[in-house]
Amino acid sequence: MGREFRAAGAATDVTMRKVPLTESLRIIGRGTRNWVSDRPLVVSFEVTDACTCFCKHCDHGGPRDESRNLRPSDFPRYMEALRPCVVQVSGGEPLMRPDLTEIVRNIQSGNGLPYTILVSNWSLMTEQRYLELREAGIDQFSVSLDFPDDRHDDFRVHPGLYAHLEGLIPKLAALGHDDIVLNSCITSENVGEINAIADTARAWGVNLCYSAYSARRTGCRDYLLNSPEQLDMLNRGFDRVEQRRDETNWIVNAPSTLAATRRYFEHASAPGCKAGLRFLVVTADGALQPCSMQFGKYKLEDRARMVEEFTRHNKCDECYVSIRSYLDKTFPQLLSENVREFLAVKGR
């Protein structure tokens, strides 16, 4: 599967990059079974609530009580019960867990599943840790980027973060693994930077995914696109992005996803969410949540009750974050987009 089984936590991203054919077939096979049997396609493990940043658009930030966090040995039980084809490891900031490599190893099944994505701000990333996590089973590294310069530091409230990314990402991209994707959450603050951020991805030699801000996490509507001028900037920015696509598929979002993102911002809503069914969150202390912005908690063995109580009656239309946007499609559409993207990548 080339690109589009995708997901998000604080800055959620499930955007599958390049996957070998045998692994693609396993993912498609499990995804088909899960779709038919109402199991989740994507599970996001929020392995910590603590974070190194205090991002303006997020409800995480700073130290938290870590005493009740799941241990690495707890993860196989969740994997056996949920059997997702894609896993997102997120937070908070997952790199704050010193045992993160062990957690990743305990998520793996040994047969190429699940496809595993690390969502991080990369403030604590080093070359050694990148290589260790690749070896443990991380297939893709999703790195948050809000601005193409040190305004990123101000938005994330982390001085020096952009300089750290600018120094490290091109160096790791040059290793040739093609497993780094910048994730840019579009807000009223950075909507005019859509293509400048794309320029940065190109300059650093990595891929790019866009996601959409939701006010549900913090209650702050200031970062939504609240004016015709901002919507015009979004549309002109995405028009240019569409022109920049090429055979490398470095723009990870499918055209259908960007089109739906435009509609979300235009209407300030996106009905029809299947949180809890197609995707779900496992919190740092092991509870199930339908998503990272719906806070009803369920035990692992009560997943079916969560679907019945929440998903079947869910009227929330307040987000179009990545974890939702890439699964908010019919199964034939989801399958065809993944197969088409895979064949495009293999044909290079």
Q: Model-found features: residue ranges?
A:
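Alpha-helix C-terminal capping segments
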Residues: 74-83, 107, 172, 201, ...
